[in-house]
């Protein structure tokens, strides 16, 4: 068959000696367009790379061959069989769904399928069970390597992730709850972010949405009620108007959410007396949010896109935090005191405004991507701290806090194809201003006024090239970051910082039979915050105060990782070396040794190892996903002449189950486990186990969904 294809190409191309434009559309067997399919043009007979493209949301692509050559097209997309065919113009290419057999069990490509991309893994969501799971939060919770909820997520082995939607940074965590899972095309989990991302970003989650079909008006309404130990409410209405290349949208979202805080804390201080404080925490927080969004996207033509979005967010009522702490204090095993503490905070939020402007374009072989953000807002908080001691009586402490924040950010990236590769260059600028005033008239020395001005100018470049032995990528980022701190309107030279640093990254990806492998190296940084540098005292209780350490150095992090994807299996191994690791540290208060000081310190080094594996098969209506992994660190400390080894590994596992039933019913049963173990300078001394269950039914061709969750 290959000989016939090549002969046809020779016959067709032999008559042409000028530049050609190869166009077409990629569809599935149901005649639906396949967006984001990869189309690569090769010359024959040596299969030299000529050009490549990604299909748009209508499945269309366009390629240019600048010389007279014998040409071959390779068309591929996750979940479909790859096709090779002669390169002609205005052709319709149909891809068949991929089906593999594992031990006599047929596994179809309707399950979210993993695919290695530069720096991470891409997960297909459209046309899978995840597309009907609920919200963006629900989708991310069921993707391997990701943990978290409510817009705040971590990537396994890396830490906190920065979330993007269509390459726009998400600055409001509630935005993921507003995103319908049916609107998500795919999710990119970038565990090794390259030079185009901020050097402080440990991981990236990039959500790509699908363009809604059709023209005219569309509406979407959602109302959710959750009950248990507390009641939560979410109401949302969205509307769109689409006409040709114009897309106008608006969204109104209200939430009233409660969260419970419970736990046991033991604090032991061994000085001239052995002090032991056993505490029980019980309380909760309630927050309410009203968020409005309006925006417009405009497709000028197939090569130029522009968009503008405005968000405003406020809290109609004050958000509250009400925590009770009951403590028993022992001195050398003898009861010393009992107390009950109550911490009550009421926060009023001033309206938060955010504006985003973007442009994406293609000028021949040059692609342009520009994003700009402006953000401003603030809060006012009133606090009350009540201490009721059996031995020392009762006292009440009052505090106030006033915070103003603003941000201006812009990023420009240019990409140009050179030979078989693509060269990207760009620049990013961020300007952040924060004013923080804290007053506690009942405790002298606990009042402060701090102004923080942070600027960061970055230049970056990346080059990616496809070769016969695999894909290579190399990048370099330079950052000039300036942190100016004013305390009580005076410049704080001991805390202000100016960093000029280089951050390289590199990766190599290849495919051996059906196994995809990627080896990556990245260099990142963790810079100390003002709170970690400040010498101001923050009151906790009679036995605990918090302060910073002005001599902290930035943590330089070196990561080496190996990622593997084979059919429905995904695995990774990561080694991390942190120099000058910033860790939480507990010291003694100089004037009163029984009082602990919670602060930060640098460790000379902190090496870690993380490994995980996930498998996601399909057995008829049952679609399970099993993940497990291990964290291990090597840390020996000496404090006050005592040697401590903190190297006990911790394990985690999750088992998510989706049952896609007839009648548009769906059942989800999810379980997660985390073991005891050391985490930096802390020890998690209890295993945790969590189970979630939900059942949902869709009506009116999936335009209405009713869901019951426990």
Predicted regions and their residues:
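Short, acidic, small-residue-rich periplasmic hinge/interaction motif at the N-terminus
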Residues: 40-42, 74-80, 90-129, 148-150, ...
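Short, acidic Ser/Thr/Gly-rich low-complexity loop/linker segments typical of extracellular
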Residues: 45-60
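Short acidic/polar hinge/loop motifs at secondary-structure boundaries
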Residues: 62, 142, 168-194
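N-terminal periplasmic accessory domains that precede
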Residues: 90-96, 136-139, 173-174, 189, ...
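Surface-exposed extracellular loop regions of Gram-negative outer-membrane beta-barrel proteins
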Residues: 208-223, 262, 289-294, 320-324, ...
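Face-selective signature of the C-terminal outer-membrane beta-barrel domain
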Residues: 291-315, 339-488, 511-516, 568-573, ...
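Outer membrane beta-barrel strand-and-loop segments of large Gram-negative receptors
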Residues: 407-411, 456-458, 553, 559, ...
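Outer-membrane beta-barrel signature, preferentially recognizing the C-terminal barrel domain
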Residues: 451-454, 494-497, 525-579, 597-610
